[in-house]
């Protein structure tokens, strides 16, 4: 059995479901490439009583054909090709009734692809669970889908026979930096923390992407080989990623492109204006689907109301694509090695590092010793017309402290000069004036290598480095 990196909570949930004294219906969901199938197959290893997967963009007859071949694999008796999903699940019931396994694990992968356009698969699944499986004590039904929105809308929020039937929901997110480090160690990939952070800025914590890194090459060489070479495995990933995850993905792509042009994010109205989409529920649905799939985040500026909330693109690969690969504008197969340290890469790195930090807020709170405290997390940007100011991360603490966190990427210890010290102090003053907070404000600086000590560094009450993100 291959070692599973991280995923301790998810593995425990699956183990508890397996040991349960009643039949359970478990759904594992999350963005494409995050390791859902691998997790379930490795967790149950040789315990699977049945496994079948859907096929992307194929019709009902083709889906039934693949399901039939899966049935034949697990059946001791010859089977006829089912003419409907109801017949297919009836055949599955007979296979499970003949199984001698104490707990019969049924794993159905890429559920949304199986369902296709006519939806008859879901109706048959309802019948299978409600009329047979749920009445027993020996069935563990595990379903997966990369189409997070489909799972939520069609299964979790089902208004028919599946309403309230899912017993466990496991949302699989990308790896944290600590889990990535464990992954590299397991793969014998030598990489210091700076390169691991840089890798996260490019690939996120997506296991499938990380599995392509070759231990014999440097990170820069791997980036060039995977992303900039015309035949690189991830050179055309953007073209496939959204189409595979979302049915009718054109509006998703419109919104993502609009967000990529505005680092701090956009309000819903700004998104509609930038994309030309109608002010209707369909736009809200697309935004929800992108958020539920870990491509964007929604946040409210400190002190602002929900109607002022912002949507921000956070998916590392997508951000990288729009900076360097969009429209095939880059023909240099060794672009990364040729441009390391240049303004083009440095300007991207500042924002990409900020997103890495925002993905590790729990680790930041732990490093600051406030993980057990009630803390509200937000960003902040000034509404003033004359003096513009923005704060990357605001931690509003129950002990009447507000941490104003500045995030800076640097290849060496970061130096605060007189001008920047004045900027930080002025920004705090504007924050206090506009928000009218009665709490004490403290400046926090999170950098790659810490601060260079000088006469101005003392204005920072708390200093964090990239090492604190690896907790």
Please give the residue ranges for each predicted region.
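Phosphate-binding site recognition
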Residues: 1-339, 343, 443
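A cross-kingdom feature that marks ATP-driven nucleic-acid transaction machinery
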Residues: 302, 309-471
């Amino acid at each position: 059995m291959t070692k599973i990196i991280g995923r301790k909570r998810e593995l425990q949930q699956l183990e508890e479901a397996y040991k349960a004294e009643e039949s359970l219906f478990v759904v594992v969901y999350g963005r494409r490439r995050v390791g859902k199938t691998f997790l379930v197959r490795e967790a149950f290893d040789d315990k699977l009583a049945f496994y079948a997967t859907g096929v992307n963009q194929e019709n009902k007859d083709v889906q039934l054909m693949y399901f039939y071949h899966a049935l034949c694999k697990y059946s001791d008796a010859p089977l006829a090709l089912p003419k409907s999903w109801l017949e297919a699940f009836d055949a599955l019931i007979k296979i499970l009734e003949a199984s001698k396994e104490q707990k019969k694990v049924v794993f159905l992968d890429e559920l949304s692809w199986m369902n296709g356009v006519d939806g008859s698969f879901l109706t048959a699944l309802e019948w299978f669970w409600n009329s047979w499986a749920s009445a027993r004590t020996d069935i563990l039904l595990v379903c997966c889908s990369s189409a997070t929105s489909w799972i939520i809308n069609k299964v979790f929020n089902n208004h028919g026979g599946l309403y309230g039937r899912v017993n466990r929901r496991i949302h699989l997110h990308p790896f944290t930096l600590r889990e990535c480090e464990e992954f590299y160690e397991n793969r014998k990939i030598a990489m210091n923390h700076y390169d691991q952070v840089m890798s996260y800025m490019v690939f996120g914590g997506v296991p499938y992407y990380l599995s392509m890194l070759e231990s014999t090459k440097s990170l820069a060489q791997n980036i060039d080989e995977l992303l900039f070479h015309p035949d690189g495995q991830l050179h055309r990933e953007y073209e496939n990623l959204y189409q595979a995850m979302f049915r009718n993905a054109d509006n998703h792509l419109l919104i993502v492109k609009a967000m990529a042009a505005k680092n701090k994010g956009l309000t819903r109205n700004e998104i509609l204006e930038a994309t030309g989409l109608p002010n209707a529920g369909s736009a809200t649905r697309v935004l929800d689907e992108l958020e539920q799939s870990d491509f964007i985040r929604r946040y409210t500026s400190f002190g602002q109301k929900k109607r002022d909330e912002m949507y921000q693109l956070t998916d590392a690969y997508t951000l990288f694509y729009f900076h360097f690969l969009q429209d095939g504008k880059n023909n240099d197969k060794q672009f990364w090695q040729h441009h390391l340290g240049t303004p083009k890469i440095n300007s991207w790195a500042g924002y990409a590092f900020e997103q890495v930090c925002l993905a590790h807020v729990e680790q930041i709170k732990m490093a600051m010793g406030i993980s057990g405290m009630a803390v509200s997390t937000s960003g902040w940007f000034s509404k003033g017309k004359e003096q513009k100011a923005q704060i990357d991360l605001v931690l509003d603490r129950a002990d009447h402290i507000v941490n104003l966190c500045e995030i800076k990427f640097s290849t060496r210890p970061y130096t605060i000069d007189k001008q920047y010290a004045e900027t930080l102090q002025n920004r705090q003053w504007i924050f206090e004036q506009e928000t009218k907070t009665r709490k004490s404000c403290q400046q926090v600086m999170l950098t790659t290598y810490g601060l260079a000590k000088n006469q101005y560094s003392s204005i920072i009450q708390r200093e964090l480095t990239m090492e604190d993100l690896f907790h």
